[in-house]
């Protein structure tokens, strides 16, 4: 994680292949990664799918050509450590390692608030 934080803020997204709202949100996460990566944003997408579902995770990511980094947390250790409770869960961490924003679940339109939070963390004009 520290290697990402040296570049800028990090948005950690917890998702699963069985979570339809997660998949809807991933489209916006990819857009944000493409839009803000040159400003220092890193998006780490962490699947809580089981080890048995690893092939589903890989094929889903390949099929959608997402550019952000994908990790696995099949035992949900990181998910629990960051107080995840609903899917999807998003946690925005500043360069000091402090959680500055957290969002649980997905509803259409949440991407606008997410964009505001990302721009603020990146110190970009609103």
Where are these regions (language model features)?
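Proline-centered helix-kink/hinge sites
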Residues: 9, 21, 27-30, 69, ...
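Structural microenvironment flanking redox-active thiols in thiol-disulfide oxidoreductases
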Residues: 23-64, 74-81
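Non-globular targeting/processing and membrane-anchoring segments
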Residues: 124-126
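Hydrophobic beta-strand anchors of alpha/beta hydrolase catalytic cores
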Residues: 11-12, 43, 90
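A short beta-strand-turn-helix
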Residues: 1-10
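Aromatic-flanked redox-active Cys/Sec active sites in thiol-based oxidoreductases
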Residues: 13-18
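Thiol/disulfide oxidoreductase modules built on the thioredoxin-like
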Residues: 6, 59-67, 73-119
